[in-house]
């Protein structure tokens, strides 16, 4: 549930931005989200392992900036690393269906809500979110099922403390 809720919190704003404001770069950004889905799952996990590791990219940057003196253990071989890895790997699976449902909303419906006196938050709450909700549900189901049954990620980045139901 933590992975699914994190994906919703991170993915919905991205999907909304792509659907409403991305302009001519919309499909280029969407393509960048789709391309990692064609990569091997194991390769993505090893990539995350090299980013989150003790000598990984995050720890190197933090040491270079002088924020830390020794590598943080927060990023690898614990439950946090499993959650971070699953969120990053599964994020496109919630962005794409949510984007699709939000992109199909005609702009004249949103304009009509403004003409009828809705403020931007009210238009989002009563028009945009209910129409785009089915895409969010589909993406949430994808993420929940894949995160629930994943057993490779806890083995490769979680160490002995990484736990999911699949393991």
Question: Residues of each region from the PLM?
Answer:
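Transmembrane alpha-helices and adjacent helix-loop boundaries
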Residues: 36-45
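Transmembrane helix-loop junction
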Residues: 15-20, 50-54, 60, 64, ...
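Glycine-rich helix-loop "coupling/hinge" segments at transmembrane-helix boundaries
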Residues: 152-167
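Transmembrane-helix boundary motif in ABC transporter permease subunits
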Residues: 2-34, 50, 108-110, 124, ...
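The alpha-helix within a helix-turn-helix
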Residues: 113
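Helix-boundary and loop/linker segments of multi-pass membrane transporters
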Residues: 19-23, 68-76, 131
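Transmembrane alpha-helices
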Residues: 5, 35, 88, 94-107, ...
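Membrane-interfacial helix termini and adjacent extracytoplasmic/periplasmic loops
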Residues: 45-87, 121, 157-161
């Amino acid at each position: 549930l933590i992975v699914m809720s994190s994906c919703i919190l991170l993915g919905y704003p991205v999907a909304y931005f792509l659907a409403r404001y991305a302009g001519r770069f919309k499909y280029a950004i969407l393509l960048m989200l789709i391309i990692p889905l064609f990569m091997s799952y194991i390769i993505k996990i090893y990539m995350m392992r090299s980013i989150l590791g003790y000598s990984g990219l995050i720890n190197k940057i933090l040491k270079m900036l002088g924020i830390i003196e020794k590598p943080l253990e927060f990023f690898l071989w614990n439950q946090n690393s499993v959650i971070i890895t699953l969120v990053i790997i599964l994020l496109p699976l919630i962005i794409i269906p949510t984007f699709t449902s939000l992109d199909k909303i005609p702009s004249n419906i949103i304009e009509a809500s403004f003409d009828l006196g809705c403020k931007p938050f009210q238009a989002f709450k009563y028009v945009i979110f209910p129409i785009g909700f089915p895409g969010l549900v589909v993406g949430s189901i994808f993420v929940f099922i894949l995160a629930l049954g994943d057993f490779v990620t806890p083995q490769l980045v979680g160490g002995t403390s990484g736990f999911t139901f699949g393991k």
